[in-house]
Amino acid sequence: MEYISKDIEKKWQNFWSENQSFEPSSSKTKEKKYILSMFPYPSGRIHMGHVRNYCIGDAFARHFRKSDFNVLHPIGWDSFGMPAENAAIKHKLHPKKWTYENIDYMRDELKSLGLSFSKNREFATSDELYTKWEQEFIIKMYEAGIIYRKSATVNWCPHDQTVLANEQLEEGCCWRCGTEVVQKEMPGYYIGITKYAQELLDDLEKLKEDWPSQVLTMQENWIGRSEGLEFKFDLSKESRAKLERAFTKYFVFTTRPDTIYGVSYSALAPEHPIVKYIVEKNLLPEKKIKAIKAMQKIPERDRATQEKEGIDLEIEVMHPLTGKTIPVWVANFVLSSYGGGAVMAVPAHDQRDFEFAKKYNLPIKQVIVGPDGIIENQTEAYTAEGRLIESENFTGVTNIEAKKAIIYHFEQNSFGIKKVNYKLRDWGVSRQRYWGAPIPFIHCEKCGLVPEKIENLPVALPEDVEITGEGNPLDTHPTWKHCTCPKCGEKATRETDTLDTFVQSSWYFLRYATDNKKWNEVGISKEDSDYWMDVDQYIGGIEHAILHLLYARFFTKVLRDLGYTNSSEPFKKLLTQGMVLKDGAKMSKSKGNVVDPDLIIDKYGADTARLFILFAAPPTKELEWNDSAVEGAFRFIKKFFERAENVNQNGLDNFKSIDHSALSKEEKEARKKVYEALLKSNEVFTKTYTFNTLIASCMEALNALQTQKNDSIWAEGYYILTNILEPIIPHACWELSKKLFDLKNFDGKIELKEEVFALESIILAVTVNGKKRCEIEVAPDTSKDEILVKAKIASAKWLENSEILKEIVVPNKLVNFVIKG
């Protein structure tokens, strides 16, 4: 048979499309598999990263579909976002037109790969129907107290003119455009993810078997749970007066209450209210005020990597236990978003505090000593365990015991409380841009902030806008933002901020799980969600570990609590695929090392691209592009296709009734290679994900078949191999299966045959006093006595004239004779 990839691939892609071959059954009687690759942003062209992601997902979907599962394998488009606005400015196109033209082009590109998506469930997150249901969720979250509006210091991208969440910063720069981010005070909407911090942390335990440990660790660290003591520092009388009595105290949180007697200074974040007040009122010399202002302009993330710097605020607080005064500084290492933006500093037992104290010549008081009890002139902080010294009634107690005892003492005397803190911050979702989902709230002078009525949703974007790159066009639109208050009917204005695009990707998997026939009536069908959720296999890059993956977990829990789903975790299994490299670097236009998938498909065919992508490296590892390996993949498919000529009618008539016992040793070996590939297939798709080893096993099986002349073995071999390879090279396999088996080998799982794996003989090592001397070959059912007789004959020259003290037979492994002398 001649292999002409273009003709074969076009034929089967049209067949699959016309017959809706990959739509899931609406019946819920079968066991299901929900396979999902992270949906793409419609940037205009697919790249090799897309190809790898979607070929992996498609392999899973096809495997489980032919294994008689009801498979949901959808595709859609994460279509809101700043790149559309930037493209609108550059190409003078409306963002909507640019976006949907890209979707049309990329849809055709993905089709050319032969991906088995459910077409009926395709949507874009910029579709008004998707926006409608998302806005309903936002209103319900607002009513439940999960969404709120406040003014805060935010990360501002001067280039994109929008706010960024902490998770969207990369080394202090915008994750999208790379512009250095600045700090800015402005009002915005926040989603209370911190309300779910403990559940998000606890439920990582449920994922530890099937998620990469690196992702779990990243999320655990990002949530950042810590237990400790929260207490107040009272300002000294003189400091209260200096601050014009605007402040009398502030609160700090510490995970080391055992070191509280070693506090030698306190430090505040540059954004702390006291620091802001001092700057606003010019309560310090001009030089210090300028230095503080400069510190305030630097994002927290950047400050964390800078050299530790501080400024004496010339105020003092009282130690809560000793009553002694302690100087207060502003320091660049204190985070306003953690523990109230204030810390107690114990230089003797914290390396950061130690370095700061050394730099500014602040006192260092040791209050914990090691087992030797020696107090030394410290060159670094003592952070090991030990016993307390110079700590009043707690002196002599181990620091572990002291933590509990000091917290108890504070609580009993109402000085402070035991508290759990998290590094995780509430999620700021306001974005000052046009191409996003409008936030469905209205500002009324009389009623304040009012959600839009559910029956008025969606709040859709106006299309008559001009994108200039200067501010948000919704702010200046002549009519769109002007409306009436849903509560009192008076004149009001719409919120012009739009939602962070990570909101859309935080629930799209639940939308897919809803039968598309119900999309007009509900955003999420609970009945359908109960059947399809959780996603059985999710595929995407590890770069989403603390952005999309955390937000998706959070949103699922919120929607559960709001009654939309019973699911608590969205993704059972997670596979994070590695990057595709060329010349040792990530493909990029600037490096000139981009490989265009369209050109590869045009030259070799989609099956070759798929085979190379899945064979070149395990999916979780980086993949180095190799032109000669692509050629090799093409040659294998061509050989596999052409060798099918060896399958004749005689073999097709008889392969299902092969008598294994009547086969020659070579025939049995060839048949075993085929079934080993089938066994490997089941293992790869459920446990190891190592598609490369499966493909190698199929190549070995084909080589083994080539040595045979048994018609039935050839027919059975192709019956099984076309089934195994269908998830990887589907077009070629459907073509062969149709010609040879009328596609019947894709109906249900092919069962393993035990007789194929039955051992014909066993090789046993024969050892004398533990030293291997020879080997014997015996049948699997040979008795122990027969084995010993055969072993003695084989090792006679080493046993000659020796007294055998012991005879040991280890089944299926060895025979050992222990002899005297």
Curated annotation (Swiss-Prot):
Is this entry keyworded Nucleotide-binding? yes
What cellular component terms from Gene Ontology apply here?
A: cytosol
Which subcellular locations apply to this protein?
Answer: Cytoplasm
Task: Note the CDD domains from the entry.
Answer: LeuRS_core
The reply to whether RNA-binding figures as a keyword in the UniProt entry is: no
Q: Which GO terms describe its biological process?
A: leucyl-tRNA aminoacylation
**E.C. number, please?**
6.1.1.4
Q: Which reaction does it catalyse?
A: tRNA(Leu) + L-leucine + ATP = L-leucyl-tRNA(Leu) + AMP + diphosphate
Q: Where is this motif: 'HIGH' region?
A: 40-50
Main subcellular location of this protein, as a coarse class? cytoplasm
MF terms in GO: aminoacyl-tRNA deacylase activity; ATP binding; leucine-tRNA ligase activity
Q: What InterPro entries is this protein classified in?
A: aa-tRNA-synth_I_CS (IPR001412), Leu-tRNA-ligase (IPR002302), Leu_tRNA-synth_edit (IPR025709), Methionyl/Leucyl_tRNA_Synth (IPR015413), Rossmann-like_a/b/a_fold (IPR014729), tRNAsynth_Ia_anticodon-bd (IPR009080), Val/Leu/Ile-tRNA-synth_edit (IPR009008)
Q: Which residues bind ATP?
A: K589
'KMSKS' region (motif): residue ranges: 586-590
Q: Which UniProt keywords apply?
A: Aminoacyl-tRNA synthetase, ATP-binding, Cytoplasm, Ligase, Nucleotide-binding, Protein biosynthesis
Where would you find the membrane-spanning parts of this chain?
Answer: none
Superkingdom of origin organism: Bacteria
Member of which family?
Belongs to the class-I aminoacyl-tRNA synthetase family.
Q: What is this protein called?
A: Leucine--tRNA ligase
